[in-house]
Curated annotation (Swiss-Prot):
This is Deltorphin-like peptide. The keyword Cell inner membrane does not apply. The lineage of its organism: Eukaryota, Metazoa, Chordata, Craniata, Vertebrata. It is found in: Secreted. Expressed by the skin glands. Signal peptide: none annotated. One of its GO terms (molecular function) is opioid peptide activity.
């Protein structure tokens, strides 16, 4: 989920 939020 972190990756998605960072994108």
């Amino acid at each position: 989920y972190m990756f998605h939020l960072m994108n």
